[in-house]
Amino acid sequence: MEVLSTSSPLTLHSHRLLSASSSSSHVTSIAASSLSSFASSYLGISLSNRTIHRFSTTPTNLRRFPQRKRKKFTPISAVFERFTERAIRAIIFSQKEAKSLGKDMVYTQHLLLGLIAEDRDPQGFLGSGITIDKAREAVWSIWDEANSDSKQEEASSTSYSKSTDMPFSISTKRVFEAAVEYSRTMDCQYIAPEHIAVGLFTVDDGSAGRVLKRLGANMNLLTAAALTRLKGEIAKDGREPSSSSKGSFESPPSGRIAGSGPGGKKAKNVLEQFCVDLTARASEGLIDPVIGREKEVQRVIQILCRRTKNNPILLGEAGVGKTAIAEGLAISIAEASAPGFLLTKRIMSLDIGLLMAGAKERGELEARVTALISEVKKSGKVILFIDEVHTLIGSGTVGRGNKGSGLDIANLLKPSLGRGELQCIASTTLDEFRSQFEKDKALARRFQPVLINEPSEEDAVKILLGLREKYEAHHNCKYTMEAIDAAVYLSSRYIADRFLPDKAIDLIDEAGSRARIEAFRKKKEDAICILSKPPNDYWQEIKTVQAMHEVVLSSRQKQDDGDAISDESGELVEESSLPPAAGDDEPILVGPDDIAAVASVWSGIPVQQITADERMLLMSLEDQLRGRVVGQDEAVAAISRAVKRSRVGLKDPDRPIAAMLFCGPTGVGKTELTKALAANYFGSEESMLRLDMSEYMERHTVSKLIGSPPGYVGFEEGGMLTEAIRRRPFTVVLFDEIEKAHPDIFNILLQLFEDGHLTDSQGRRVSFKNALIIMTSNVGSLAIAKGRHGSIGFILDDDEEAASYTGMKALVVEELKNYFRPELLNRIDEIVIFRQLEKAQMMEILNLMLQDLKSRLVALGVGLEVSEPVKELICKQGYDPAYGARPLRRTVTEIVEDPLSEAFLAGSFKPGDTAFVVLDDTGNPSVRTKPDSSTIRVTDKTSIA
C-alpha cells in the first residue's frame, strides 16, 4: 500500500496512519471501517479492505514502511491514532447529521451536532442543557432545512457500523488542526471530543456560533467547561491522562509516546514544583477579573508574537497593576477570547521564593534554573511569568560574593531569551529596572519594556466595580456606588505614598472588614441590651408573639379536625404571621462614611463628614484662640478662616491648607497663636512641627530639612521636615523667625508653597497638601523697639499715633519687600501683621500667666491668690510696647514666683494652704498664708481654673 502525500493542512504535522486499537474487536472494527472513509475524505487517500484487516490484526507491521517508500514519499503523522473512540464516534455522528440534512460535505455546524450527539451527559452538552434534538431544530431553523419525520428518525438511529464517504470542509479541517494543537499543548497523547470542541469554538467560521447563539449558549462558558473537564481528567497524573476515567476519556491505543519516561517526568516536576499555572487558576475562577488596560495588553500580545526577543517586561510603580495584566492574559486564554496563537499557550508564574529556598550547595540554584529553562524550551507552549524579576538579577554564586565558576542567573537566561526559545513576561519597578537592568545592556535588550502607568480615577472606579463582587462575597457586604467613588477620591487625595488602584482596593477591603466587625459588635450589644431590659419595656412584643402563637395553634387544630384549612393555607398563615427574622447572613451595607473612617485612620487626616461636635469646634475656634492670644483679632480671624476652608473642602487640593507669614514686634503672640491652634484643633501642642530657623543659618543646613545627599552622614535617615510630614501629614509646620535662615533655605520653600510637595534626598515625593504652613518674622520690630529714630525711615511720636496699627503694617510690609525675594512673597497666601500690645491688654495676659502658675501649684497642693494692687504693679513694671509680653513674664517671675519659692523652702506652706500675694506697708510685694474657708485643697483641681 502506498500512502501519497496531500495538500491538506494537516500535512504540516507529519501525518502517519492509525495503528490498531487495543480495545474490543467490535470497537476496533468500527474504528477501522469508519476511518477508511474518514481518511479518504480528509486526506485524499484510499484504504482497501485488506489494509483495514491489517489495521486490526498487525498494527506494528503497518508502521514499518520500506526504506524506499520513506525516501520517496512524505510520511503521514499519527494524528488519527490519537483519536479516542469517543472522538471517532462524534465524527461519525457529524457525517450522519450532514447526510441527513442533504449535504455532501461536513461543515462546522454538523461537527457541532456530532459532538452534542456523542455527549451523553444528563445535563446536556458540556453541562449546558443543550440536547441533540434542540440543536437539530436550531440548525434546521437557521438554514431552512426542516426534514421529514423519516429523515429525522434516520438521523437519530445512526450506528457505528454504517460507513460513509462524507468529506470535510476546509473550516472543519481547521477545527481538527486546532484540536491537534491544543492536545499537544496539554501534553495529551490522544484527541478527545473536548479537544475538538475547544478547536471548534476557537476557529469557528461563524456557523457553529450562530447555532449556539440561537440556543442561548455562551461559547466562552462552553470552552471553559471543556477545559475544566480535560484538566480535571489529567490533573491526577501530571500531563498523563488518567487510565481510570473510562467514562470521559479512553487511552489511545498506541499508549504513551516516546519520551514520556522518567526523564520527561522529572523535567515536568521541575516546572510544576516552582511554578503556578495561572491559566489553570483562571479556568477555576481563582483569579480576580481584570478591567481595562486594553492598550497595555495589546502591546504585550504584540511583543509575544515576535519571532525573537519576544519578552515583554512590565514597568511601573508598586500597585499600578503589573501582575494583573499577566493574570488578565491568562483569563483570556482560559476563556478562549485571546488571539488564536495564544490559545495553545500556558502562563506559568515562577515562584522565586520556592526556586531559591533550600539551595544550600554551590551551583544548586543554577541547576534548578537550567532544568526549568530546559523544561520550558521542551514544552514550547509555556510563557513564563516572573514577578519582581530583579530579585533574580545578581543571584547565584556570583551574587553571593563567591569567586570563580559561579554564574549569575541572568547569564543563564540570556541565550534562551535572545533566541526566542524561552518566552517570558517579567515585571519590576522603574527604580529596580534602572538600577539592575540598565546596568546590564545585554540583558535589557532582550526585554521589551511596557510602561504601566497609574490609572486615572475614572479607570480606577471601573476596576473597583469589576472587583466589587469578589469583596462583597468575602465580607458578606454590599458596597454602594458612593462608597466606590469615595474610595478612589479619598485614596487619591489623602494617601500620597501609594498608587491607584492598589490603595483604593485596600480601602474598600478594610472598610468591608470594619463594617463586618462593627455589625458583629452591634449585634452582640443589642443582645446584651435585650437581656438587660425589664419585661415591661417589651410587653407589647410579647403580646404580639403570643397572639401569633395562638393563631398557629388554632390553625393546626383545624387541620387535625379536618374542618377548614388545608396544609398549604396553614403554612401560609404560619409564614405570614411570623415576622421576618434578620438572618446572620444578611449583607451589610458599606457606604462612603465607612470608607472615610478607614481613610482617616490610615492617613491621620480627618476626611469624614463634619460631625456636630466638630462643627461646634470650628464655629467656636476664633473664641478659643482669642482666649489664649490677646489683642490679635486680625491674626486669629485669618488663621481660623484657613482651617475652616480646609475642613469644609473648599481649599485648593494641590496646595497646602495655607501658607502664612506672621510679622510684627517681638513678644506679641506670633508663636503663641500657632501653639494655640495646634492645641485647640490639631489635638495638642506636640502635633505642631516647629523648626527654629536660627539653626539653619548656614548654606549646607538645607540638607537637614530634606535629608543629606549621598555620601554624607545621615543619608539613609531622611530630613527632619520631610520625614515628619510623611509620618503625620495633617499638622502645623512653624518656621520660627524665618529671616534668620540662610537665603538658600527660601529657595526650597518655593515648591512647597506653590505645588504642595517636596522631594527628599531619597527621591520620594512628600505631600504638604494637608499641612498648615506658618512662618514668623521680626522684620520691623527693631525699628519699633528703638522708638523715635527707627531704622525703617519713620519717627515715632510720644502719643498713640506713633504706634498705630495702620502705619506699622504699611512700614513692615515695605520692609518685607526689601528683605525677601518677590517670588517668595508672591507665593504666600496671607501676610498677617501683629499689633503692638496696649497697656489694657497686659492685664488680660497677666491673668493668663497667673492661671498657668496656679496649674503648676496644684501639684504642690497649694492655692494662689494675687491682690489687685500686685497685678497693677506687675503690669506697670512689665509693660514695654517695643518688647511685648516677654517683659511681663519676667516681672511675674520676679514679683510672684521668686518669693513663692523662698516661702516653700522656708516651710511656710503645707498642703491645703493658699498663698496670698499682697503689698506690704512699704509697697513691696509679700507672700502670706491664707488658711480659711476659701482655701483650695489638693484634690480640688477644678477650682483652680
UniProtKB/Swiss-Prot annotation:
Residues covered by region (Repeat 1): 90-146
Stretches for region I: 271-523
Induction note: By dehydration and salt stresses. Induced after one hour of dehydration-stress and reaches maximal levels after 10 hours. Induced by cold, ozone, senescence and dark-induced etiolation. Down-regulated by ozone (at protein level). Not induced by heat stress.
SMART domains reported for this sequence: AAA (SM00382), ClpB_D2-small (SM01086)
Pfam families: AAA, AAA_2, AAA_lid_9, Clp_N, ClpB_D2-small
Biased composition (Acidic residues): 562-574
Record's keyword annotation contains Repeat: yes
One GO process term, biological-process aspect: protein-containing complex assembly
GO terms for cellular component: chloroplast; chloroplast envelope; chloroplast stroma; plastid
Region (II): 590-781
Catalytic activity: ATP + H2O = ADP + phosphate + H(+)
Presequence boundaries: 1-89
Cofactor: Mg(2+)
Keywords tagged on the record: ATP-binding, Chaperone, Chloroplast, Hydrolase, Nucleotide-binding, Plastid, Repeat, Stress response, Transit peptide
Organs and tissues of expression: Expressed in stems and leaves.
PROSITE patterns according to UniProt: CLP_R, CLPAB_1, CLPAB_2
EC number(s) from the headed UniProt entry: 3.6.1.-
Localization terms from the record: Plastid, Chloroplast stroma
Biased composition (Low complexity): 241-255
Miscellaneous comment as given in the Swiss-Prot or TrEMBL entry: CLPD is consistently found in two distinct forms, the full-length protein and a lower molecular weight form porcessed at the C-terminus. The processed form might be the active form and not the full-length protein.
Role according to the record: Molecular chaperone that interact with a ClpP-like protease involved in degradation of denatured proteins in the chloroplast. The ATPase activity of CLPD is stimulated by CLPT1. Has no ADPase activity. Interacts with transit peptides with a positional preference. Localization of the signal sequence at the N-terminal end of a protein seems mandatory for interaction to take place.
Subunit and interaction comment: Homodimer and homohexamer. Hexamerization upon addition of ATP. Interacts with CLPT1. Stably associated with the import machinery.
Protein's UniProt name: Chaperone protein ClpD, chloroplastic
